[in-house]
Curated annotation (Swiss-Prot):
Residues 1128-1139 have a biased composition (Acidic residues). Its EC number is 2.7.7.6. This is DNA-directed RNA polymerase subunit beta. Belongs to the RNA polymerase beta chain family.
Amino acid sequence: MTQLAVPSPVAPTFPDLVEIQRESFLWFLREGFEEELLSFSPIIDYTGKLELHFLPEYRPGDPSKGYKINRPRYDPEEAKRRDATYQAQIRVPTRLINKETGEIKDMDVFIGELPLMTDRGTFIINGAERVIVNQIVRSPGVYYKSELDKNGRRTYSASLIPNRGAWLKFETDKNGLVWVRIDKTRKLSAAVLLKALGLSDSEIYDNLRHPEFFQKTMEKEGPYTEEEALMELYRKLRPGEPPTVSGGQQLLESRFFDPKRYDLGRVGRYKLNKKLNLNVAESVRVLTVTDILAVIDYLINLEYDIGHVDDIDHLGNRRVRSVGELLQNQVRVGLNRLERIIRERMTVSESENLTPASLVNPKPLVAAIKEFFGSSQLSQFMDQTNPLAELTHKRRLSALGPGGLSRERAGFAVRDIHPSHYGRICPIETPEGPNAGLIGSLATHARVNQYGFIESPYYRVENGVVRKDLGMVYLTADEEDEYRVAPGDVPVDAEGRITADLVPVRYRQEFTTAHPTEVHYVQVAPVQVISVATSLIPFLEHDDANRALMGANMQRQAVPLLKPDRPYVGTGLEAQAARDSGMVVVSRTNGVVTYVSADEIVVRPDDGGDPIVYRLQKYQRSNQDTCLNQRPLVYTGDRVVAGQVLADGPATEGGELALGQNVLVAYMPWEGYNYEDAILISERLVYDDVFTSVHIEKHEIEARQTKLGPEEITREIPNVGEDALRDLDENGIVRIGAWVEAGDILVGKVTPKGESDQPPEERLLRAIFGEKARDVRDNSLRVPNGERGRVVDVRIFTREQGDELPPGANMVVRVYIALKRKIQVGDKIAGRHGNKGIISRILPIEDMPYLADGTPVDVVLNPLGVPSRMNVGQVYECLLGWAAEHLGVRFKLMPFDEMHGLEASRLTVEAKLREAREKTGKDWIFNPEGKYCGKIQVFDGRTGEPFDQPVTVGRAYMLKLVHLVDDKIHARSTGPYSLVTQQPLGGKAQQGGQRFGEMEVWALEAFGAAYILQELLTVKSDDMVGRNEALNAIVKGKPIPRPGTPESFKVLVRELQSLCLDVSVHKVEVDSEGQTHDVEVDLMADTSNRHTPSRPTYESVTSEDLSPSPAFTRVLRTADANASRSLEEDEDEEEEEDF
């Protein structure tokens, strides 16, 4: 493994990349859950006789105290196998006090079940791995903003936003008065609010820096007493109700000073103290009079240009809510419901017999937690396509979800990259489409602090010297604004002194330059700005951001291949990404390997403890149907150290991420087969399994209890030949190892059928012979259309074995089918620079363009895909990969290498190519002179002639993406129709048709293809009578009759009529005297027959009809010039026939 000649700064090892998930969940277990229980304790009944106390305080070192989590019933692997949830029971110590008798009852009460996090940062809910995405929301606190009215007068407003409770908004107007709105209600004078809080005039004026500004507001309202102010407050908030002083008092208390109704949260209190320079204790989570006065004071100061307004998109004002906090909020919802139930039970039951266990019902808490994990927008099915996808999913930041934004309301400002994102949120990795900017990814070195604000690490700089010896300092976006921060690629000498005269710095969100002695901090590494996926792109700085975004997103869609191959050109972050994803097995201790097999590794630790057994995953199915398989990397007798990779997982090789393959590419056009991003590949990629991947599909069937009796899993299936049952065992379940194709039976199942289900011929047989034909129907599980493969696993679940089954099911059988998918035309492949394309042709090896030594290239890419897309990084990568192959080394390049001098990338690549040329003695590898620098003479495989121009050839790292043509290709003959419009449904899952949209209609109109157009809009779509008649005509070999009225036209007419528009359809008829009459057509004439299913009738088909008629034979011979004429004659003959 050769390092580059240019010294790359060693990035400090990243923090643990899944830390954000694990730490947050641990906080919930240690503090969050306890905090919630304490906030509800004690629960007192309506008469005040009974009190129920929760005593969940966690005492480290004293296991008798605190709430207890029982051992989970299943381990994570078993939970996955059984489709169960990996969860544990929670028991909380409670105390019930009877005030009348003084009796005290203590006991541990079961309060509910809590899903536990696996060591990989995921949850297993009903057998599926899920991830709780981190939510980024506006932080509670006070926000000031300024607005210009239409006269150009500037007004200011302050919004006081709590964690939960009523909003308070103060605003100034053009007359210099201060108003307040409570929860967006009508305006109320701020003087009235302050008076209602019991403040005297002198107390108000003493606490303001500019009392003269507020005097106008006080004078306008007149001299209010506290009682009058409370009445006025009540009048404004509850118009229409008779105002009372006590009502006003209670309203004010409950809105802002009751901890149950109003909560600033720890963060809100911290932000409020910081912004307004207060020193209220952090435990005070409600508003105080001091807070309200300080908010008004700051607002008035803004009128005198003291202080500054806030930017709500600044990361100092947005915080991250991770798993722990989201779960805590959900527990609060459950405990609220529980509190109501406990109070009711206290009132209803006899107090002598009450125990804490009889009061506490675990259902509401269990339901709230289940709802959160099962259906919350932030609880997502884990993206398990490859290790990077899994890692990125756990580090995702979403602005959507409950309490966040919605796609429709989010404007440009929220989505935009903000200067404070620097080093905290990746400016590149975000989805394309409606979620752009709302979903981001945490930067590589960023971490979330105790308040939920994102911090980024820096080294301190003193007098122009970078002090790495002092360790890293983590700063939030707010703190960083006060300092001059230099980027991580500033040139420094051996002592750490900055060598440049002027350094680019960021200061107060501006990018400027400064002298080295003025710099306060310097970034830890150049990659700390970007996310993990983005930092895996080599030569990132030479790619346009839009393409880098696609490159980062497409790496997450790469399918793990059969033979993983590390990139020749990497960035050095592959190993850590693979390790933290949890897909590789890592040694926990130093020791010696004592046993290795395909499915387990045993290590004897050096400290003499028990041997550690590491179980490997073998051919498991991932959430995305890719194959999870781990392969041992160590041998018996090897010494291992803690943190060493013991076994590779999917898409990793040697403990490094290996998402794709290093293939030989040439940038040249080839017979138009790489027009518009299409890609031409060599047959070698198919034969050598270069881009072959394994996919595992799951098929499931339930045997249920029906009204007519139980369904049965059996081999005895009616009307099925022995051939179709050849792979089923005696129970009717397919054997492991069988090869199955579309339509084959996987599990035989028969369902009892009632009298009504029997066809007429069966009823006739029973009437004549009186025997019961076996009254069951075939309901077997079959391989779906377009799928095939080998059965790799069969799992049977029954109640007798103690499995939990869905209600009504007696038995569940699950069959897993694996298939090797070779690369084929229509598959999508891509590079790491956003250069994606569809395979258009697979060419025999001998026809591919070849090099001077006879090596055929693997992939031919279009050179026109580079200049307009501006992702030149792919060219650098392909040339450096070319040098790497000939030198027999792999390169690791940190992105942003310009710190080593101008054009460092180009000079490095050139130097390595020269070195390769000299070492191998092959002069044709690199041509350093002239305008063809870096290009090679390539020969046409078909003729052996050289191509006109030299061509860029090299080793590029290409990925096969999960968008495989096998999963997308789909055809429909007849199938389901939409109920209202009667048009075919859309989509593969619905067995749907292809949409013929308005633009396609325009195309046919432009060609004047009237009959094709008419068919497409009627008999092939929603003319119900016409399509049945057309099918009958085709079956009988007769000409297709004229189409009728489309159903959607009838729907349109009915909709217009429902808007009270008199719309009707008329036709002009001519009578025998030549007079024209206007006749209204009843489009709904056939509604009486609508309840019959729309399918063709075969009653009138005779055996003569089914033999190919001359008319039908003539239709097939379309080349015959007389065909059209003979069809017209046939039509005339058949007019009389009753269809």
